[in-house]
A protein has these predicted regions:
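Bacterial N-terminal signal peptides that target proteins for export
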Residues: 2-15
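Residue-level signal for mature regions of secreted extracellular proteins and peptides
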Residues: 18-19
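C-terminal motif of bacterial Sec signal peptides marking the signal peptidase cleavage site
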Residues: 22-24
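A structured, mid-to-C-terminal "fold-capping" secondary-structure block
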Residues: 26, 141-272
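Post-signal peptide N-terminal segment of mature Sec-exported envelope proteins
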Residues: 31-64, 79
């Protein structure tokens, strides 16, 4: 029987109190400017070229050799395997109920779901609800910082970039890679396989970009909006949405005047 170490009690209590206090901080407002746009566009072009040359063809090949059921089973496995990331961040966000529910989901799918390949937990009213360290930092009140595009990673921000090392420390895929040193970096193959499954799931949404004038702006704004909804559990306040969309300080009267002038010009007969 493991002996109880009473000397750690005060420190553990203090740590828990600090975490709950931090989690109660006001979320910093979203940022709408893009001070590093020149650099970001270069990185976006690099990532787009890498995607077209290697990543997308690999995802397409993966879809060709797997059935929808097989892909769903594989996605279930990776989602369950990475559940420790969500559970720990639930605790850091002072959400013990979410942590308990996601722990139950992890246990059910790891056992009844044969290692996570199947998802009986969803049928038991324990749906997948993921979170990460970037959301944790946001709920602690850390400002978003400038938008950033990272090579081979894509859209992120100065705040969200810290989720990569933090979440990797909680990710069994990261544990596997860090504990091995195989030839040709083969220890990273499971992580690469996970990324391929994510890219394959995005193939169906590619038609959304067909009519997009500036894909860089589309990805940037879509990323910021998605993160905002994740931070607020799908219900961001109207003020945060207005700031994100740049409509918080709009002069409605000025916009109406501009619209009126535009309509007048269109109504004037053309002069030859």
């Amino acid at each position: 029987m493991r002996s109880k170490n009473t000397s750690t009690g005060p420190r553990a209590g203090l740590l828990a109190a600090c975490l709950f206090a931090l989690a109660g901080c006001t979320v910093a407002p979203p940022r709408t400017d893009d001070p590093w746009e020149k650099f970001n566009r270069k990185m976006y072009a690099f990532n787009d070229a890498a995607d077209r040359a290697v990543i997308r063809p690999t995802a397409v090949a993966y879809r060709k050799v797997t059935s929808p059921n097989a892909r769903r089973v594989i996605s279930n496995f990776f989602a369950n395997l990475r559940m420790p990331i969500t559970i720990v961040n639930d605790l850091l966000q002072a959400e013990p109920k979410d942590a308990l529910r996601n722990t139950g989901r992890f246990v059910v799918n790891s056992t009844l779901g044969f290692g996570g390949f199947f998802d009986p937990a969803s049928a038991m009213r324990m749906p997948l609800q993921e979170t990460d360290f970037g959301v944790t930092l946001a709920r602690w009140g850390l400002p978003e910082g400038p938008y950033l595009v990272v090579p081979f990673v894509g859209s992120t921000s100065v705040r969200d970039i810290w989720r990569m090392p933090a979440d990797r420390a909680l990710d069994p895929l990261g544990w596997y890679a860090d504990s091995r040193d195989l030839k040709l970096h083969a220890e990273e193959l499971p992580s690469m396989m996970y990324l391929v499954t994510l890219r394959a799931r995005g193939l169906d949404a590619e038609n959304l970009l067909d009519g997009v004038y500036d894909p860089y702006v589309f990805y940037r704004d879509a990323y910021r909006q998605r993160r905002l909804y994740e931070i607020y559990d799908g219900q961001p306040p109207a003020e945060a949405i207005e700031v994100l969309q740049g409509t918080d300080d709009l002069d409605i009267d000025a916009l109406l005047d501009e619209q009126h002038e535009y309509e007048q010009k269109r109504a004037e007969p053309e002069k030859y």
